[in-house]
Amino acid sequence: SAAYVGMAVFITGGKGAGQYGYVNTYNAGTKVATIKKYSDNSDGWEQIVSGRAIEAALDNTTVYSVEPRVVVQAPGNDGSTATSTALCRAKVADGKISEVRIIHPGSSYTTAPTVTFTDPNNTADAPLETFIGDGVLAQPAFTSRGTGWTTLSATIEDVGQEKDITGVTFTANPYAEILLTAN
C-alpha cells in the first residue's frame, strides 16, 4: 500500500523527541513502515537537535506525528549550490496545508529552490512560491492551500522487548519499523 509512503514522521514528545524521517515502505496488512533519513535516504532517524543521540528504543512517553513531507531541493543547472538544504514541516489544518514551518533555512542559495510536498492521500496540490534572503530560504507564500492532506498521531504501549506505539514497532535493527493507523 502506498497510503503513507513518502510522508514525514516527526517524534514530537517524550523519548526520541526531535527525531524525524520519512516513510519509505508501508504494508497495509501488517501496518509496518520502514523509515529513511531525509539527508541521504539511508535507513533510520535523524535528529533536529544537533548533538542529541538517536534513541533506538522508544517508550510510552514517545509521541509522533505523520504529516506531508516537505522537500526543499537546491536549484539545478543555474550555478547555485546550497551548502545546506532547508528542513521544513507542513502544518495541516482542516485538510489543507496552513503553513510551512522552516526548522533549518539551509544556506548559500543564490536562486529560489523547488519545494515539493509528499502525501499520497492529498486531492489537490498546494503550489507555493519560494523566496531567498541573505542566501537562506524565507517563508513561502501559498497560491493555494490544496485539500485532503493527512496527519495522524499515536500513543505508545510497552510490550516486552519491543515498543509498540499504537502500531509502531521499533526493533534492534538499524532502521525503524513503524505501524501506522489513521485517527
Which sequence ranges carry the predicted segments?
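Short beta-strand-centered aromatic/proline hotspots
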Residues: 18-26
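Short, solvent-exposed secondary-structure boundary/capping segments
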Residues: 27-43, 98-101, 178-180
